[in-house]
Design a protein with these regions (language model features):
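Short, small-residue-biased leader/transition segments that mark boundaries at the very start
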Residues: 3-7
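Mobile beta-alpha loop/short-helix "lid" or hinge segments that flank ligand
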Residues: 31, 35, 91-100
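Membrane-interfacial helix-loop-helix junctions in multi-pass membrane proteins
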Residues: 96, 100-151
Length: 170
């Protein structure tokens, strides 16, 4: 048995997907690190301790993993990069603008309030904002957000796995 035997082994498809998703998560953490340094230069004073940092990192990991799975699954059904970029913009921009990322939604009423509250990113943004800006967290809300994103991550991973199997078994 030599090194050549190692290279001849078949890689599990779930490992391929997991590697792709974890790469996206690592890139996300690098981006978050850079943005954190930049925010400190603008005199942002986060309420960070070990617990809030750990809880925030869990939320960032789950969010990045979920979105990476969705993006990977979408990339497997589209014919080229131009279509991928167009579709991702059509998904990401409404999700971003229909969340509480840019404006407060406390007094909002009606259909728009319903849409914003149905957006999972509204909840994860609120949880991260509460952790970093105020150093507090509502445990029930935090567990809801973690459960929601574990579910979304599981579904997106499963869908990406399904799409990869379908793509490779043509």
């Amino acid at each position: 048995r030599g090194l050549g035997d190692v290279y001849k082994r078949q890689i599990k498809r779930s490992s391929i997907i997991l590697g792709q998703l974890l790469e996206a998560v690592i890139c996300t953490f690098l981006e978050v690190g850079i943005m954190s340094i930049v925010s400190l230069l603008f005199s942002v004073k986060p309420q960070i301790n070990l617990i809030t940092l750990l809880l925030t990192l869990i939320l960032v990991f789950l969010t990045a993993f979920s979105m990476a799975g969705l993006a990977y699954g979408i990339s497997l059904i589209l014919p080229n990069e131009v279509m991928y970029e167009t579709v991702m913009n059509a998904i990401v921009l409404p999700i971003f603008f229909l969340s509480n990322a840019l404006f407060p939604v406390d007094g909002m009423k009606g259909f728009l309030a319903f849409i914003i509250n149905a957006n999972p990113f509204t909840h994860v943004i609120s949880a991260i904002r509460s952790l970093l800006l105020y150093g507090t967290i509502d445990i029930a809300n935090y567990l809801f957000v973690v459960s929601l994103f574990v579910l979304i991550a599981s579904i997106s991973f499963g869908w990406a796995f399904y799409r990869l199997n379908k793509e490779m078994n043509l």
